[in-house]
């Protein structure tokens, strides 16, 4: 991003909210629409688009209260994974752990809506959190906002044998907030794009994003099926850069399978990302799991993992169940991280392809299961054979 251009835009009297280098955009806020007309007339500005409108008379919304803590999770001594054992065993991620690959030396960014009580829950205190950043509201407390990201984090990072062990328990984490749970506007894709670039700047290896968009408060912005080509939505274009930057992006397919939309949601339509659908613990498709393919006929979702009755940590510090591709994605993300740790010579795109090729439906992929349930141990063995 050319600093001179950003400064000239700022000098028009607007506040710069975020910038994006990869897609060459600047997001600004102002109270006077004529300022946008002046910016649009600048010789280096290609186009402008309204991505957010402030609620009348309201200050930015943020959470201040916290859910009460119990912090008395049950212990299940039969497995270090606790009740979450089946959601990692289904893809043989536990065999990677037994081989010594638990995410050591790898960094994961979780881009989500908030991480409620993750800083207070006793069972999560040994998760290696390197830092946090809020792209929605710098004055907000990321640990007081939505519980969604906290439950997502628990699927990957929990490291309490007998209570719950996640799919990459020894990885390190950046917790980034890009989703504003109080509204649905295009600006959240701007926040997300900035979060992805920040993750790249701090050395992240793998990203999980259990977010997706197709409908907005401004209905004129809603997506149509033809928009699912990996190029229409800003998130999808940004996501398509991630592997070229040396990171693997794992994202949720969406939960629209039972509604009128049914399809995956951006950024899940992007190229060179792993889009994850949801199954139950018997490997049967969750009815809500969004389906593909993309508008340009690429296979989506890529793979599936447990997302119906997934085991998570709740905001009270005890175990619970959750449904959604929001949880199949991080379960897969952690295993992908451990696989890449085991196969350090591979590029991001090669890791993604290795995971696809290990799926139990690799010979007949479809728009429901994609390439199926990956076998992470088989993927590792295939890597060793080809070295």
Task: Give the label of every model feature segment.
Residues 112, 123, 265-341, 345, ...:
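Extracellular S/T/G-rich loop segment that most often corresponds to the catalytic His/Ser-adjacent loop
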Residues 5-88, 94-97, 271:
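Autoinhibitory propeptides
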Residues 97, 159, 175-269, 295-298, ...:
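Substrate-binding/access-modulating region of protease and related hydrolase catalytic domains
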